[in-house]
């Protein structure tokens, strides 16, 4: 994190409606994996999570941790290696297979009986289960409640018109005394159509505020050279902690 600016008083952009009708289909997301357009994947894992992880875990083991739209996030192995049970959901079977291959983990495949035509991939160790299906179909599997959710690249990828349904799905999966770790991006939405989409603080309050205490832990400068192609010159990432009211 050296050289990374941190600020908690960044102004939000006022034109929050400009992206509201943007839509990416599940097929388009699958095509991104097939065509290798996965610049959103972080090979070294998320640095803000790495920074705060031990503080969040507080020495606990055996937690159930959920990864929405997990892709091949290396952070799943971080939690599994610390003795936690990881469940993820990802529409791309290729992304799931790449996770197990790149992490050198053996796995098995089973059909998801509640969702015909879909599969769940389970590590041989038994503590990583990745469901290959739509996030909105997942509640039908009765996967239970979770102690923690790590939402990086999920809420910001959901079509803006589907956010309320997504948030309700996430809230339905949370157990008592949960910790919901949420990363969102702040940039001028008039210059880039998304995804990832711009999610202002007011939207987080609208989606989760009735159930959750919402605290912004950190805002960091996340602008990279590749973001110039988005037509923007400024990009910040914000890490939120949502807890039970």
Curated annotation (Swiss-Prot):
Q: Which PROSITE patterns match?
A: SAM_MT_TPMT
Annotated substrate binding lies at 40
Q: Which residues bind S-adenosyl-L-methionine?
A: 29-40, 69, 90, 134-135, 152
Report the EC number(s), separated by commas if there are several.
2.1.1.67
Q: Which reaction does it catalyse?
A: S-adenosyl-L-methionine + a thiopurine = S-adenosyl-L-homocysteine + a thiopurine S-methylether
What top-tier enzyme class does this entry carry?
transferase
Q: Which GO terms describe its molecular function?
A: S-adenosyl-L-methionine binding; thiopurine S-methyltransferase activity
Superkingdom to which the source organism belongs = Eukaryota
Q: Which GO terms describe its biological process?
A: methylation; xenobiotic metabolic process
Q: Which UniProt keywords apply?
A: Acetylation, Cytoplasm, Methyltransferase, Phosphoprotein, S-adenosyl-L-methionine, Transferase
> What InterPro entries does UniProt report for this protein, alphabetically?
SAM-dependent_MTases_sf (IPR029063), Thiopurine_S-MeTrfase (IPR025835), TPMT (IPR008854)
List-wise, which residues carry N6-acetyllysine? 58
Q: Name one GO cellular component term.
A: cytoplasm
Any one Pfam family match given in the protein's UniProt record, by short name: TPMT
Alphabetized Gene3D superfamilies for the sequence: Vaccinia Virus protein VP39 (3.40.50.150)
Location, primary (coarse class):
cytoplasm
Q: Which family does it belong to?
A: Belongs to the class I-like SAM-binding methyltransferase superfamily. TPMT family.
Self-association state and partner proteins as the record states: Monomer.
Entry protein name: Thiopurine S-methyltransferase
Organism name? Gorilla gorilla gorilla
- What gene is behind this protein? TPMT
């Amino acid at each position: 994190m050296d050289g990374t600016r941190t600020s908690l008083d960044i102004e939000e952009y006022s034109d929050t409606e400009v992206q509201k009708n943007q839509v990416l289909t599940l097929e388009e997301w699958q095509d991104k994996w097939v065509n290798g357009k996965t610049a959103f994947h972080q090979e070294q894992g998320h640095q803000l999570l790495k920074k705060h992880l031990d503080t969040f875990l507080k020495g606990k083991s055996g937690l159930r941790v959920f990864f929405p739209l997990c892709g091949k996030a290396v952070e799943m192995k971080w939690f599994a290696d610390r003795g936690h049970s990881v469940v993820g959901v990802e529409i791309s079977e290729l992304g799931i297979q790449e996770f197990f291959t790149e992490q050198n983990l053996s796995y098995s495949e089973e059909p998801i009986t509640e969702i015909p035509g879909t599969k769940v991939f389970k590590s041989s160790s038994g503590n990583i289960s990745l469901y290959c299906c739509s996030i909105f179909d997942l509640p039908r599997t009765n996967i239970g409640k979770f102690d923690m959710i790590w939402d990086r690249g999920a809420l910001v990828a959901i079509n803006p018109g589907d956010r309320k349904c997504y948030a309700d799905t996430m809230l339905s999966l949370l157990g008592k005394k949960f910790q919901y770790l949420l990363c969102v991006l702040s940039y001028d939405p008039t210059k880039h159509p998304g995804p990832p989409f711009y999610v202002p603080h007011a939207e987080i309050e609208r989606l989760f505020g009735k159930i959750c205490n919402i605290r912004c832990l950190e805002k960091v400068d996340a602008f990279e050279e590749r973001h110039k192609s988005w037509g923007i010159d400024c990009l910040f990432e914000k890490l939120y902690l949502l807890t039970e009211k």
